[in-house]
């Protein structure tokens, strides 16, 4: 599993935007699909809200391939 850290520039970032920003998918539409299909876990729980507000301290798992830790700015 690959581990990434993401430092927030604002108070939060929407989940699908973060996935796209980190180039884990080719498009925003693909990001929305993997979230909607339940491939993303947030703090151990499946997160299907595409626009969920991701904040400092959250830990995301995208599939079984990537773990992302969110840090404050």
Model-derived segments and their meaning:
Residues 49-73:
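C-terminal structural segments of small proteins and small subunits
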Residues 13-56:
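A basic, amphipathic helix-loop patch mediating RNA/tRNA/ribosome contacts
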Residues 1-13:
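A detector for short, charged/polar N-terminal pre-domain segments
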Residues 2-4, 38, 64-68:
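Generic structural motif recognizing short loop/turn segments at the entrances and edges of beta-strands
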């Amino acid at each position: 599993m690959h581990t990434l850290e993401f430092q927030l520039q604002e108070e939060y970032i929407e989940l699908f935007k973060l996935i796209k920003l980190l180039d884990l998918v080719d498009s925003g539409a693909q990001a929305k699909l993997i979230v909607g299909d339940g491939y993303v876990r947030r703090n151990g729980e499946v997160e299907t809200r595409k626009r969920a507000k991701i904040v400092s301290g959250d830990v995301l798992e995208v599939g079984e391939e990537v773990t992302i830790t969110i840090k404050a700015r």
